[in-house]
């Protein structure tokens, strides 16, 4: 997690937006659970994982679109063959992923990332809470 936020900070210092994908809910059999994160940079490279395979590919595409459009979104993925919205995985579950566009020009974003890194450096228990009610909340 620390490396992910360090890389996010580097992107922001270069003036580049990025997308942070976070699994916020999972049900049934899924490769990763809630709290798993992946950073996708403007050039399409990624750090972290939200499960690999088809779900990670779809999340990466959604992240690249978020960086391009500068908008966050909430996406649901079905990992069960034959169900509506099936993406071709056979795990048997469902995941909900919050794709959060991180704008380098957002007031206070650098300070927030610095706070996250300082908490991670001392290994304190903490929560990073996202407001999902407004797509451009962060």
Regions found by a protein language model. Give the residues of each.
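Segments forming oxygen-rich coordination pockets for charged ligands
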Residues: 1-138
């Amino acid at each position: 997690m620390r490396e992910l936020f360090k890389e996010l900070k580097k992107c922001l210092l270069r003036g580049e937006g990025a997308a942070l994908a976070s699994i916020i809910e999972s049900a049934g059999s899924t490769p990763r659970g809630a709290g798993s994160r992946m950073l996708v940079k403007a050039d399409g490279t990624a750090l972290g994982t939200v499960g690999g395979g088809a779900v990670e590919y779809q999340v990466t595409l959604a992240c690249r679109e978020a960086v391009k459009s500068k908008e966050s979104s909430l996406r649901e993925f079905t990992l069960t063959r034959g169900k509506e919205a099936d993406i071709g995985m056979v795990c048997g579950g469902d995941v909900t992923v919050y794709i959060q566009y991180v704008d380098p020009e957002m007031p206070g974003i650098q300070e927030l990332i610095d706070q996250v890194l300082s908490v991670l450096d001392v290994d304190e228990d903490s929560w990073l809470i996202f407001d999902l009610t407004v797509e451009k909340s962060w």
